[in-house]
Amino acid sequence: MTSTSGSLRRYLLTRLALVVPMVLILLTLVFVLMRVAPGNPIEAALGGHLTHAQLVVRERAAGYDRPLIVQYGQYLGQVLTGHFGTTLTDQRPVTQVLAQNGAATLELTMSAMVIAVGVGIPLGMLAGRLRDTLVDALARLYGIFIYAIPVFFLGLLAQLLFGHILNWLPTSSQASVIVQAELQPHTNILILDAMIDGQWGDIPDLLAHLLLPAVTLGLVISGVVVRLVRVNVMQAMKGDYVEAARARGLRERTVVVRHAFKNALVPIVTVTGLQAALLLSGAVLTEETFNWPGIGNELIYYLENRDYIAVQGIITVFALAVVAISLLIDLINAWVDPRVRY
């Protein structure tokens, strides 16, 4: 085993050791927050029309009649086994809700991240290279302005302009009714399902429905990426390695991409990855705005109905996803820059 792979392995084990207490703290917070909510969650979720006997039966089935420490142990066991109980409002297994609606959220967030990086990195690199020019000023203005707009407001503007005034794109749902009826839910990511079934003619409809919510969410995140890339490229351009590359007669584009950007990559990866985690919270508002059938839309539905069993399961998965993304960012940084490992 080489020293490089050995140091990377030690770094991975160290990060995993830190993740365990972090996850335990997060799970404890989720459990406590769900238990301090006012009122009886069983009665509230079912409309308050239960008799006392029916309420007792429901509480026993959900485990709410047991001591808190027993409920906490049961909750940790559910996390370990991946079984989060059954929703109170529609009697669906929470894992089924996560599988069916989580795929739509994954499709939206991944598409939004591609747009954020595709817009933010080139624009930030250009602004960092052309410091104190009109291009730089416009890039800075874009970064501040686009990130300051609430994602739901930008979504409403996009719906108004492209859906109602210009009538170019659909403004809600994941697909038209006919297309959705044709597809078999192999993965619940409809574009992928269409490819699996060979329904290539349905893909334009699916892309049209995906475009507005993905662009809305992606543009908001791109504001952070632009400013981050600009600052780090500007700092990297002052390095001796950049001057050495120029002295060798390399083209300015090569100097920026291969030398300045590469050395600015670690903080860019870190913050961009954290923005990917924050996409989950932005996806909740985006899904509600565009009636996108993702897990965020379901979360709002269950919150409105005070179905805390469903809410607890969804928030738990969100929290674990954020921790997993953070761990992945650390590993990518350690791979890109060996100095991070020590």
Predicted regions: what they are:
Residues 22-73, 162-202:
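Hydrophobic alpha-helical transmembrane segments of membrane transport/permease proteins
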